[in-house]
Amino acid sequence: DQPRSRGLGDVYKRQLLIYYSASGNWTPYYCVGLLTADANSDLLNPNSWKKSLEPVFKQAPENHVYGPGSLCFIPSPDKKEWYILYHARNALRDMFVLDGRTTRIQKIEWDENGIPILGIPQKESTLLQKPSGTPTSDRN
C-alpha cells in the first residue's frame, strides 16, 4: 500500500460535489450548501442530485463569525493538506453594509468516504500552522 494524499480529485472519481453559497451575503444567514451526484449518473436529471438538508458551513456566533460563504478549496504546496478560503463578518452590526467582510482560511479534514469536512468557522484571530510543504526561506 502506497500512502496517498486525499484531494478533491479523489472525490470526483466517485461523486460530484457542488458547494454553493445561499441567502444574501449581507445577512448573518449567508451560508454554504452542498449538492452531490454519483459521477456515473445522468447529471442533467434533477433526480440524480441530492441537496444537503442543512447548510454544511454556516455562522458560528460562539466564534463571532457571521455569514460565511463563497468558499474555494486550496491545497497545501505538497497537496497533503487542504484548506478552504472564504469570507465572513465578525459582528452582527452593519450587516446590510456591503463592506466589512473579511477573507479567512482554515484547514479541512476528510471523512471515510472522501468528502471534505469543513468544520465550524473559526475566530478571525485563530492562528494556523504553516501548510504542509511550505518552502523555508533563507532570508532573515
Task: Describe the function of each predicted region.
Residues 1, 70, 87:
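Histidine-centered active-site/metal-ligand motif
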Residues 1-8, 12:
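Single conserved hydrophobic/aromatic residue that forms the stacking wall/gate
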Residues 6, 69-72:
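Beta-propeller and closely related beta-sheet repeat lectin domains
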Residues 13-16, 21-63, 77-82, 87-140:
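Beta-rich carbohydrate-recognition and catalytic domains
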Residues 65-67:
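Repeat-based blade/solenoid architectures
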